C-alpha cells in the first residue's frame, strides 16, 4: 500500500487523506477528527511525515479508531508511534487483543464526543461514528460507499454478512442530524447528508420490492 503524500482539510476539525491499494483495487480514505481530547485517526492509512506533522500541529493524538475488521490498515504503526489506545468493536479483532485495546459498542461515546453506532450485518465489527458539533458528521466504514462504480450506495450484498440486517441498522442514522458524511471508500459528502441518506434508503426500499 502506497503512502499518502497530502491531506485535505474539509472542515476546521476534520481532515481526510487517501491512497490507492493495488491489492484491493480500491481507493482507501482515512479521517482525522479533532475533539476536546485531541486528534482521533479513523481507519488510518500511512501518511508521509511532513503532512502528518502539519495535520497534527501541536495537538495530541487521542487514539486510533477502526470501523471494522478489514480496516486496521496502518493502525498498529500509529498506536506504537504515539502510544495511544485502539478503539474497536470486539468482533473486528477476534484473534487479536493489542495492547491498549478499548472495546466499543453501540451508544458508547469516545472522548465524550464521538458516538458509536453499530451497523450489524455489514463487515465484522462494523460501526459508524457520529460527531454532533458543526451541524453533525458521520464517519462510516464499509456499510456506505461513495466511489466508482457504485456512487453513493450501500455496501453490495456479496460483501455483507447479512444485507437485510445491515439495511435495518443503517436506518438508525436517520435519527441524527448530520450535514456531512466521511467515508473509508470515497469522497466525502459535505452538505445535505440527511437528505442524501433519506433518498438512498427510499431508493433501496423500492429496489427490494
Label each PLM-derived region with a short phrase.
Residues 2, 6-8, 12-15, 21-23, 77-80, 84-125, 132-134, 161, ...:
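Metallo-beta-lactamase
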Residues 16-63:
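Pre-active-site segment of Zn-dependent metallo-hydrolases
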Residues 26, 48-51, 71, 122, ...:
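Amphipathic coiled-coil/heptad-repeat helices and related helical stalk/stem segments
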Residues 40-42, 63-66, 116, 182-183:
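Short catalytic-loop micro-motif centered on adjacent basic/acidic residues
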Residues 48-49, 69-74, 93-96, 145-147, ...:
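Active-site environment of divalent metal-dependent phosphoester hydrolases
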Residues 48-89:
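Active-site metal-binding motif and surrounding structural segment of the metallo-beta-lactamase
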Residues 55-57, 78-81, 101-102, 152-155, ...:
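Short, glycine/charged-enriched secondary-structure capping and boundary segments
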Amino acid at each position: 500500500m502506497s503512502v499518502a503524500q497530502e491531506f485535505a482539510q474539509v472542515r476546521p476539525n476534520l481532515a481526510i487523506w487517501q491512497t490507492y491499494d493495488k491489492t484491493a483495487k480500491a481507493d482507501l480514505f482515512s479521517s482525522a477528527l479533532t475533539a476536546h481530547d485531541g486528534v482521533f485517526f479513523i481507519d488510518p492509512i500511512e501518511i508521509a511525515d511532513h503532512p502528518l506533522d502539519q495535520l497534527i500541529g501541536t495537538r495530541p493524538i487521542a487514539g486510533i479508531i477502526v470501523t471494522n475488521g478489514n480496516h486496521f490498515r496502518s493502525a498498529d504503526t500509529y498506536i506504537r508511534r504515539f502510544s495511544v489506545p485502539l478503539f474497536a468493536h470486539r468482533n473486528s479483532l477476534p484473534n487479536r487483543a493489542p495492547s491498549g485495546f478499548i472495546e466499543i459498542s453501540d451508544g458508547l461515546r469516545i472522548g465524550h464526543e464521538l458516538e458509536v453506532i453499530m451497523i450489524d450485518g455489514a463487515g465484522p465489527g462494523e460501526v459508524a461514528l457520529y460527531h454532533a458539533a458543526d451541524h453533525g458528521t458521520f464517519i462510516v466504514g464499509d456499510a456506505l460507499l461513495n466511489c466508482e462504480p457504485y456512487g453513493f450506495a450501500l455496501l453490495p450484498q456479496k460483501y455483507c454478512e447479512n444485507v437485510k440486517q445491515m439495511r435495518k441498522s443503517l436506518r438508525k442514522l436517520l435519527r441524527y442530524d448530520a450535514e456531512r458524511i466521511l467515508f473509508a471508500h470515497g469522497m466525502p459528502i459535505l452538505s445535505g447528508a440527511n437528505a442524501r441518506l433519506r433518498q438512498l434508503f427510499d431508493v433501496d426500499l423500492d429496489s427490494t420490492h
